[in-house]
Amino acid sequence: MATFQFDLVSPEKLAFSGQVDQVDIPGVEGDFGVLAGHAPVVAVIRPGLLTITAGGNQQKIVVLGGLAEVSDKGLTVLADVATSVAELDTAQFAQTISSMESSLAGKQGSELDRAIERLDHYKSIQHQLNATAMH
């Protein structure tokens, strides 16, 4: 299988850089996969699990939004936050969800709508993590 250059960058670090076979990205308009030779595109990323496949191995990364750019040079993802599932503190993640739920009562209108949407994204990630842990 043909490979391509993939760089995953967050404000804290270069989370990944190397040749990959495929990257599956949680897009705002739907999840999508990128292979070598993919058409150029820029897409907004929603919070979710990004999956990197290289040499038959998969690595899952939690991303909390950002941008993906596919060009003739490869794929670059600029993520607001990027944390490897292996490094994720699942208890802390669950506590964050609990805190988000508690704070909903103090919000109204569009602020409440945004908070609910963000909470839904976190719960979706938690569900994906739990499903991944069972495999």
Curated annotation (Swiss-Prot):
Record-linked HAMAP family: ATP_synth_epsil_bac
Key word Cell inner membrane present: yes
The entry's keywords: ATP synthesis, Cell inner membrane, Cell membrane, CF(1), Hydrogen ion transport, Ion transport, Membrane, Transport
Protein name as it appears in the record: ATP synthase epsilon chain
Location within or outside the cell: Cell inner membrane
NCBIfam families given in the database record: ATP_synt_epsi (TIGR01216), PRK00571.2-4 (NF001851), PRK13448.1 (NF009982)
Bilayer topology term: Peripheral membrane protein
A single Gene Ontology CC term: plasma membrane
Subunit structure: F-type ATPases have 2 components, CF(1) - the catalytic core - and CF(0) - the membrane proton channel. CF(1) has five subunits: alpha(3), beta(3), gamma(1), delta(1), epsilon(1). CF(0) has three main subunits: a, b and c.
Family of the protein in this entry: Belongs to the ATPase epsilon chain family.
Coarse class of the protein's main subcellular location: membrane
Single GO MF annotation: proton-transporting ATP synthase activity, rotational mechanism
Pfam families linked: ATP-synt_DE_N
Keyword Membrane attached: yes
Coiled coil location: none
Functional note: Produces ATP from ADP in the presence of a proton gradient across the membrane.
Cross-referenced SUPFAM superfamilies: Epsilon subunit of F1F0-ATP synthase N-terminal domain
